[in-house]
Amino acid sequence: MTIENEALTLKKRFRGYFPVVVDVETAGFNAQTDALLEICAVTLRMDEEGVLHPASTIHFHIEPFEGANLEKEALEFNGIRDPFSPLRGAVSEQEALKEIYKLIRKEQKASDCSRAIMVAHNAAFDLSFVNAANERCKLKRVPFHPFATFDTATLSGLAYGQTVLAKACKTAGMEFDNREAHSALYDTQKTAELFCGIVNKWKALGGWPLVNEE
């Protein structure tokens, strides 16, 4: 691989990190006490031209952990009326996370990256719930960096002057259906599209590859 082609790889672009877009829906704001109810992850790939695209999607509804707090306002906000309904097809936190991590490790290895890094809108929130679930499930091999993230709320504020996901997407020229919002699946797909758009726009403006990098 030439130096020029190497600069257009996922590994080179993010310094060995493998970005994975994540969104969670929860039963409150406290990661230690409130239930994690839904999670989606979208992996990314970089084509031969150095353009970033969404790749694989994995999505789960999750059973509230034993003793979890369920805030009524949060359930009304995300539309999960009955977290215990069998119609949700929910699985345990452990099952969901293990399957997500299995996919991440496979694609991370294929990209020759050393570690996954979470991409999310207001990423500290999503990472806090994932980290809390990791602790509850006593998961030892977690692919994500424990605190580093790419936050699309911050990035879209810089790129488009908007920090709300729906407004950032619309300003970027993307379609956004507010009726679908607050579903982890839909929000993750839109966050992935937004992140790829920002990265690709920066490249198109001449910001990558770095001209002075040896």
UniProtKB/Swiss-Prot annotation:
Keyword Transcription recorded: no
Site location (Important for substrate binding and specificity): F29, F77, F125, F147
Enzymatic class: hydrolase
UniProt GO MF annotations: 3'-5' exonuclease activity; magnesium ion binding; nucleic acid binding; RNA exonuclease activity, producing 5'-phosphomonoesters
Keywords for the protein's UniProt record, in alphabetical order: Exonuclease, Hydrolase, Magnesium, Metal-binding, Nuclease, tRNA processing
Binding site for Mg(2+) 1: D23
An individual GO BP term: DNA replication proofreading
Active-site residues (renumbered): H182
Cofactor note as given: Binds two Mg(2+) per subunit. The active form of the enzyme binds two Mg(2+) ions in its active site. The first Mg(2+) forms only one salt bridge with the protein.
Matching Pfam families: RNase_T (PF00929)
Cofactors that this protein relies on: Mg(2+)
EC annotation from Swiss-Prot or TrEMBL: 3.1.13.-
UniProt keyword Ion transport present: no
Listed GO CC annotations: cytosol
Limits of the Exonuclease domain: 20-195
Residues that hold Mg(2+) 2 according to the record: D23, E25, H182, D187
Record function comment: Trims short 3' overhangs of a variety of RNA species, leaving a one or two nucleotide 3' overhang. Responsible for the end-turnover of tRNA: specifically removes the terminal AMP residue from uncharged tRNA (tRNA-C-C-A). Also appears to be involved in tRNA biosynthesis.
Family in the record: Belongs to the RNase T family.
Oligomeric and partner information: Homodimer.
Protein name from the UniProt record: Ribonuclease T
